Amino acid sequence: MSKQMEKSALGKKSSGVVLKEITKIFQQPDTGKDFVAVDHINLNIQDGEMVTLLGPSGCGKTTTLRMISGFEYPTSGSVFIGERDVAKIPPNKRGISMVFQSYALFPHLNIWENVAYGLKVAKVSQDEVVRRTNAVMELMQLTGMERRFPNQLSGGQQQRVALARAVVIEPSVLLFDEPLSNLDAKLRESMRDELRALQKRLGITSLYVTHDQSEAMAISDRVVIMKDGVICQQGTPQEIYEQPASRFVANFIGKANFIDGIFKGRDGEAALVEIGGKTFSIPAPGKMEGVQKDGPCCLAVRPESILLSEEEGPLPGRVSRATYYGAKVEY
């Protein structure tokens, strides 16, 4: 399908999303006490941007997604899709689509009927239903499978159908709730790349929820790290990995070795840190909040930044374990 056909058939109503001071409080049924799931979050997602909410279980990422979709209403705050505050508007009036972890396909409908379902509910003309459904079937490489049923497809094919059903209604925002977690590792990687390529082609504003760090790094324009209902840090995947704002972020994204030291001051864009009686100049272009001169600090050193040598180096060490991964050995 040509780029012109894609743009004319799909994704022409994309809008940005803005969250202003969003809070969600649940009452715990056993104790009756309030539980703050999301605590005064502010987030701005640009039109056409792919943003991932990433964090451990219980951090509030899925609740945030559900408040944007309309499946949960915020206790306080505003949810803007484009220029409209939709915080109290039901899901079917928001112009969004959602791709679920479970696919949620109708088992009694064939693939073509599953994809066309949303258009028929919206009372789109039959000619338009046929045109748009056929266009998205071709786009998602489902041509030839129109008369099959969901139980006759593989997991990856079912996920393509779920995605086709989501984009065919031309949503202003596309939401993903851990859509690849039911797939095996190899297929998950393939579908991840396919999904990202589709989003970039169509330019639909997208919010993706996952707890898989590598998935978030691979598909996102921007990653938002959450913990305990608040945003810890947001930035491009490279910014998050290379300039983590806290020990939690450094440890959650990739792997890191943590080394305690004494902060001796700054030298331009570098921090002077004393470790084991020796002073090292460490690249530190960002802010160092809460760190005082001659006070304790912590360095996060990525495994790939450490070079092993039999010759004497600035820091002595001992190899305690080596793990073979095929393409690499991790010490």
Describe the residue ranges of each PLM region.
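Conserved ABC transporter NBD signature motif
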Residues: 77-85
